[in-house]
From Swiss-Prot:
It comes from Shewanella frigidimarina (strain NCIMB 400). GO terms for molecular function: 3-deoxy-manno-octulosonate cytidylyltransferase activity. Keywords: Cytoplasm, Lipopolysaccharide biosynthesis, Nucleotidyltransferase, Transferase. It holds the Pfam family CTP_transf_3. This is 8-amino-3,8-dideoxy-manno-octulosonate cytidylyltransferase. SUPFAM superfamilies: Nucleotide-diphospho-sugar transferases. The gene is kdsB. Pathway: Bacterial outer membrane biogenesis; lipopolysaccharide biosynthesis. It comes from the Bacteria. It is found in: Cytoplasm.
Length: 245
C-alpha cells in the first residue's frame, strides 16, 4: 500500500484571495504546509493539487511536486479525485488529504492517521482527526466544526453547533474536527459519485455525506491542534506560533 499525501490549494477565496501564497515568516503558506507534512514518517509522496499556475510556480520554486487539476472541480473531494486519477494510484493505495491552509500541522498527527489504517485494515473506509477544545471561544464559533463519536471512535456526527449539548452542565470535553482525511483511492472514487447529502448541504460539511450514506469514519484524537488560516488576521497568529515551534 502506497501512501500519497495531497494538499488541495486554490487561489480564489472570498475572504482571503491568494491565501496559499500569503507570506508567513518569509515563506508562502503552502510551503509551510508542504515542509511540515514532509517530516511525517510513512509517506511515499507529497503533491500539491491545484488549478492555478501561480501556486504551481511557487511550489516548484521550493522543490515541491504539483499535480494540475481541473478548474471545474466543484469541491475539495472532486479536486482530490481528479488528482488521484492523474497520478494513476491503485485502488488500495492510501490517500491523505491535508488542507492547504494548515501551516501548523504537526507531522505526528499525520503519522497517527496513517497508523489507523495499518492497525485496523479493512475495518473502515475513511479516517480523520479531532482535538479537544481548550479555547472556550471556539465552542460556539461555527468556523470550528465540532464532532461526536462512539466508544470505538467511530464518528456519529459533525456540526458547526456545539455538540453534545450539556443540559445540566458545561463541564465536559468537546472535540473539534481537524481538516485532515485519510481514505483509499477506491473510496474516494465512490464518494465522489454520491449525490449531495441533505445534512451535508445544511451544515456545508462534506464529511457528512459519508455518514449519510452509511460509511464509517474512524476518529483519532490528536495531541496537537492544527488551526486553519481563514482570514488575513490569522497570519499573525501563525507567525507567533511558528516562532516558538
Amino acid at each position: 500500500m502506497k501512501v500519497t499525501l495531497l494538499i488541495p490549494a486554490r487561489y480564489g477565496s472570498s475572504r482571503f484571495p491568494g491565501k496559499p501564497l500569503a507570506p508567513i515568516n518569509g515563506k508562502p503558506m503552502i510551503q509551510h504546509v508542504y515542509e511540515r507534512a514532509s517530516l511525517a514518517k510513512g509517506l511515499d509522496s507529497i503533491y500539491v493539487a491545484t488549478d492555478d499556475d501561480r501556486i504551481k510556480d511557487a511550489v516548484e520554486s521550493f522543490g515541491g511536486k504539483v499535480v494540475m487539476t481541473s478548474p471545474d472541480a466543484a469541491s475539495g473531494t472532486d479536486r482530490i479525485n481528479d488528482a488521484i486519477a492523474l497520478l494513476g494510484l491503485n485502488d488500495d493505495d492510501l490517500v491523505i488529504n491535508l488542507q492547504g491552509d494548515q501551516p501548523l500541522i504537526d507531522p505526528i498527527s499525520i503519522e497517527q492517521i496513517i497508523s489507523l489504517f495499518e492497525r485496523h485494515p479493512g475495518e473502515f473506509e475513511m479516517a480523520t482527526l479531532g482535538f479537544e477544545i481548550v479555547d472556550k471561544r471556539e465552542l460556539d464559533d461555527p468556523m470550528h466544526v465540532k464532532m461526536v463519536f462512539d466508544n470505538d471512535h467511530n464518528a456519529l456526527y459533525f456540526s458547526r453547533s456545539r455538540i453534545p449539548f450539556g443540559r445540566d452542565t458545561n463541564d465536559y470535553p468537546v472535540y473539534k474536527h481537524l481538516g485532515v482525511y485519510a481514505y483509499t483511492k477506491r473510496f474516494v472514487n465512490a464518494f465522489a459519485k454520491l449525490p449531495l447529502g441533505r445534512l451535508e448541504d445544511l451544515e456545508k460539511l462534506e464529511q457528512l455525506r459519508a455518514l449519510e450514506y452509511g460509511h464509517k469514519i474512524k476518529i483519532a484524537i490528536s495531541a496537537f491542534d492544527s488551526p486553519e488560516v481563514d482570514t488575513p488576521e490569522d497570519i499573525r497568529k501563525c507567525e507567533l506560533r511558528l516562532a516558538v515551534d
